[in-house]
């Protein structure tokens, strides 16, 4: 591990010198590239320097303790020695996490798809509840969200809703929401008070740039139609809604939330790019995958990841066996406790799988 940390510090020093080179400063593309690399390395290098400083303090304290000292001074040095050792253990743990390879998509914006599954109108209603929870979470993080496409129901739910969330690190925190979410509650229409179980599926995709995915225009079939609202009534008198079919894969995306056909097409292409990128990523992962499944989950949309039980006020994440009796707060957008626990487990898994390499 320490060879990697020293190499990171050496590279950081090298880049810092390059950033003061007039030739680099005058080349904006090169300058931006080095600035990004410098920013990516900064946290781990600062933490490694802190580790080196504390290690030196421990050595100095140890040397003093080997000398003949008066009682009061020895006690003071002994206390400093113990505190420095405890601090060093904390820094070591932080460094282990920082050295875990970062998901290249972590800083990206996301496209989220929520679809009602088993349970009819109840599933559609909960799709709306979960959409609002994620929208509130985005607001708490000061991220921006925008609906790209939706199929609302008359009772205020969604058969399907597709939206973007824009903000630094959005994918790093929301990627764990992909999968099947199960809700257990008594529907308002249920006179006997019987609990119903419904499911919805969530897919979280990193938003990708045009340069990340090559799409041949001849592979696309583009259809226009009139946008419709809840219950199917037409809300626009022109054919502004767009449906794009990517013929090689059969992927179909649509967007009807803008009045402009051009804007709807741009948004639909944004969704398509992310879907094609996801397929390419999955193929790449499968090629290098080990014969194990992460405890946090594969991100498979068919995997049941979480249950929301209204009568008990309970939320259970099945991937990490975490239960919180904070249903109301979670659905009000307080997702950090769940997400932090998932990230911690994911990092521990990655550290465990990489421990053999550290020899």
Swiss-Prot record:
Residue list for modification N5-methylglutamine: 233
PTM annotation: Methylated by PrmC. Methylation increases the termination efficiency of RF1.
Domain of life of the native organism: Bacteria
Short name of one Pfam family: RF-1
Any Gene Ontology CC annotation: cytoplasm
InterPro entries associated with the record: PCRF (IPR005139), Pep_chain_release_fac_I (IPR000352), Pep_chain_release_fac_I_sf (IPR045853), Prokaryotic/Mito_RF (IPR050057), RF-1 (IPR004373)
Keyword annotations from UniProtKB, A to Z: Cytoplasm, Methylation, Protein biosynthesis
Main localisation: cytoplasm
Compartmental location: Cytoplasm
SMART domains recorded: PCRF
MF terms (GO), sorted A to Z: translation release factor activity, codon specific
HAMAP family hit by this protein: Rel_fac_1
Family: Belongs to the prokaryotic/mitochondrial release factor family.
Role this protein plays: Peptide chain release factor 1 directs the termination of translation in response to the peptide chain termination codons UAG and UAA.
Listed name of the protein: Peptide chain release factor 1
Organism: Ruminiclostridium cellulolyticum (strain ATCC 35319 / DSM 5812 / JCM 6584 / H10) (Clostridium cellulolyticum)
Gene it is expressed from: prfA
């Amino acid at each position: 591990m320490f060879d990697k940390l020293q190499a990171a510090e050496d590279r950081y020093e090298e880049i810092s010198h390059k950033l003061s080179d007039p030739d680099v400063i005058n080349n904006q593309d090169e300058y931006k590239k080095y600035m990004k690399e410098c920013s990516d390395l900064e946290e781990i290098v600062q933490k490694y320097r802190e580790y080196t400083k504390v290690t030196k303090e421990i050595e100095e304290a140890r040397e003093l303790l080997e000398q003949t000292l008066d009682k009061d001074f020895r006690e003071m040095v002994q206390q400093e020695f113990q505190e420095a050792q405890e601090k060093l253990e904390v820094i070591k743990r932080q460094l282990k996490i920082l050295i875990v390879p970062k998901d290249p998509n972590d800083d990206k914006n996301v496209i989220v798809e929520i679809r009602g599954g088993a349970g009819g109108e109840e599933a559609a209603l909960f799709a709306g509840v979960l959409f609002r929870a994620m929208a509130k979470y985005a607001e708490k993080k000061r991220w921006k969200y925008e609906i790209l496409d939706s199929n609302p129901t008359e009772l205020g739910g969604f058969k399907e809703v597709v939206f973007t969330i824009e903000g630094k690190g959005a994918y790093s925190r929301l990627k764990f929401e992909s999968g099947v979410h199960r809700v257990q509650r008594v529907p308002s229409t249920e006179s006997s008070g019987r609990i119903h179980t419904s499911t919805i599926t969530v897919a979280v995709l990193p938003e990708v740039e045009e340069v990340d995915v090559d799409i041949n225009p001849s592979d696309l079939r583009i259809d226009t139609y009139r946008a419709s609202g809840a219950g199917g009534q037409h809300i626009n008198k022109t054919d502004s809604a767009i449906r794009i079919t990517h013929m090689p894969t059969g992927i179909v995306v649509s967007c009807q939330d803008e009045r402009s056909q051009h804007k709807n097409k741009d948004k639909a292409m944004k969704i398509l790019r992310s879907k094609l990128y996801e397929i390419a990523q999955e193929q790449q992962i499968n090629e290098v995958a080990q014969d194990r499944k992460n405890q946090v989950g594969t991100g498979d949309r068919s995997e049941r990841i979480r249950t929301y039980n209204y009568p008990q006020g309970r939320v259970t994440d099945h991937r990490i066996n975490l239960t919180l009796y904070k249903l109301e707060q979670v659905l009000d957008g307080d997702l950090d406790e769940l997400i932090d626990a998932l990230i911690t487990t994911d990092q521990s898994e990655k550290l465990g799988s990489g421990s053999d390499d550290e020899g």
